[in-house]
Each structure stands twice: as C-alpha cells, then as structure tokens.
C-alpha cells in the first residue's frame, strides 16, 4: 500500500511569541528536538522510502533524526514551505498584537477569505501536488512530508 504521511515540525523556540512564518533563524526548542527524536523512533520500523521537508530550518531539524535512523536523504521541497503571511515578525495575540492595530483590520476582517497572505486555494494546490508526487515516486511504500501547521491544516 502507498502511504504519504504529513508531519508538522516540532515545537519552535519562540519566547517573543511572534508569527515567524517563513522568517529564518527559528529553530526547534528542546521539546521540539525531543519530538523529532520520537518521530524517528516511530518511523524506525516503518517502510519509509523517502523523506521530504520544507526548506525552513525547523522542518529540516524535525526530519533529520528519522532520516539518519533510516539512512535516507532529506529531499527539500518548497511546496512544503509555510504559508506566506504579511504579519511575519509581529505578535498576533490579544493585547499588544496585530488584532489591536487598526491598520491590520483590512487584512483580517474575513478569516475565511484571507487577504493577509497566501490564499488557501494555493496552499491546497501545492500540498496536493506534493502528496501526488510523493505517492507516485514511492508506489507500494511510505513517504514522509515534513511541513507546517497551516499547509497541513
């Protein structure tokens, strides 16, 4: 049976609680590294033939332990990258976050039709593409795609 697993990267060290999106330099926390090790344990006895990961560091870090355990390369694929977002680098919370900045309201008035970044339809298209690609290149086997919350959601 052909199986494509989608996995969100582990917990990220983000003490300022900003929306980091595609920003560089956001690495896994100690807990996130532990999560990546647990995935490696889970996958050690699975017939995973290929590992794909977003180019962002946190996804690469999450994929590394299982790739090492399985002796597989990590294939970086931009289709797995986090959604583009104009709020990168800002806090998005109650209080001092984006929600209390009137200049931001034009972007968030309709959460079902985002105007703050990459349209959902484009996310669906690229994630569907990578799923089909992974399945067709690993027929009868399993593959693992390490991505981010919004693209998987």
Feature annotation, model-predicted:
Residues 13, 58-60, 83-84, 151-153:
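Short, active-site-adjacent cap segments at secondary-structure transitions
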Residues 36, 63, 101-102, 152:
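A general structural signal for well-ordered alpha-helical segments in protein cores
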Residues 68-129:
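Phosphate-handling substructures
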Residues 2, 7-76:
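Active-site-proximal alpha-helix that buttresses catalytic centers in soluble enzyme cores
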Residues 37-44, 124, 128-136:
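Generic structural signal for well-ordered alpha-helical scaffold segments
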Residues 9, 79, 148:
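Cofactor-binding loop segments of dinucleotide-utilizing enzymes, especially the Rossmann-like FAD-
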Residues 60, 128-153:
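Active-site-adjacent alpha-helix immediately C-terminal to a catalytic or transition-state-stabilizing loop
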Residues 53-54, 125, 146-147:
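Short beta-strand scaffold positions
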């Amino acid at each position: 049976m052909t199986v494509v697993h989608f996995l969100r990267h582990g917990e990220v060290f983000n003490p300022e609680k900003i929306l980091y999106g595609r920003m560089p330099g956001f690495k896994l926390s100690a807990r996130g590294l532990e999560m990546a090790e647990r995935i490696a344990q889970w996958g050690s006895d699975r017939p995973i033939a290929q590992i794909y990961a977003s180019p962002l560091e946190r996804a690469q870090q999450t994929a590394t332990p299982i790739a090492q355990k399985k002796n597989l390369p990590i294939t970086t694929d931009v289709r797995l990258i986090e959604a583009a977002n104009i709020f990168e680098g800002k806090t998005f919370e109650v209080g001092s976050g984006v929600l209390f900045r009137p200049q931001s309201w034009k972007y968030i008035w309709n959460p079902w039709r985002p105007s703050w970044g990459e349209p959902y339809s484009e996310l669906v298209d690229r994630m569907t593409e990578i799923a089909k690609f992974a399945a067709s290149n690993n027929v009868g086997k399993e593959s693992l795609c390490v991505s981010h919350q919004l693209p998987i959601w």
